[in-house]
Amino acid sequence: MMADSVFNEHAHKALAASYPALPAHLSHSLASHPLLDMEALAGLATRMRPETLEHNAAVDLPLGISNADTPVNGLSVHDTIARIDECGSWVLLKSIEQDPSYASLMRDVLAEIAPLIEQVTGPMLRMEGFIFISSPHAVTPLHFDPEYNILFQARGSKTMNLFPVADPDIIGQQFFEQYFAGGPRNLPWQEEWAARANPISIVPGEAIYVPLLAPHWVQTHDQVSVSLSLTWRSEWSFHHADACRFNRRLRRLGVSPRPTAIYPVNNKIKSYCQRALTRLGG
């Protein structure tokens, strides 16, 4: 168990005021945690399942690039970590809870905010941890995530540019429906959208709460960046996902369904229909 609180009183109040629909700029005490230094992360990468490691070239990427078009860097993931200050790349360590030490860290941090979260969206489900190791000026293109997320900055600095979940110009229903049917999460980009962004910059000791499904893109600043991302789902998020699958099913039958609802409106009827059809093998 962690001896000290990760979040101070101000951070708890900021998260409570924003969760679940709005982003929040928070402070935290994890910046000097030994599990987040580069030596520890290089060691973690050697213990992880290969399929939970990702890396690619990441400097000067177009914001609307697809996963399939993202360039490789010609290095192994371990060499990329060793040369991260010079190789213009990005490394993602996924599902870090597969390692007992990082699983304990994740549980302890999320347990601290569980009472706040659970009184709003119910139990924290499918908790996962991710670590991003990025070269200076690395770009993470525009995308959305199916989880609630707190991004903790441990080294270097970066800016996240967030957009509203309900902005149909940026993230129409078709993107949700495609993603929950197995499609990509990256989104196309138009330059005129830049003025709609809510940019939040973080340095070590700061964090961002990223709302479920909120489109965002990220760029690191002049130094190597290390960020810890802790995520969770809720019953509402799973109902939304299944409702998106049901809408896609209806479109294939020639029906134009109403869009899935945004929190706090639920999507249970469509969700239960999708689950019933899935059980029947449809």
Predicted feature residues:
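A short hydrophobic beta-strand segment most commonly corresponding to one strand
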Residues: 173, 222-238
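Active-site-adjacent segment of 2-oxoglutarate/Fe(II) JmjC oxygenases
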Residues: 191-195, 200, 241-276
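Short glycine/proline-enriched turns and hinge-like loops at secondary-structure junctions
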Residues: 143-146, 153, 163, 220-223
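A gly/proline- and charged-residue-enriched helix-loop-helix capping module
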Residues: 97-131
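A short beta-loop-beta micro-motif enriched in histidine and acidic residues
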Residues: 126, 139-149, 195-196
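Conserved short histidine dyad/triad with adjacent acidic residue
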Residues: 130-144, 163-167
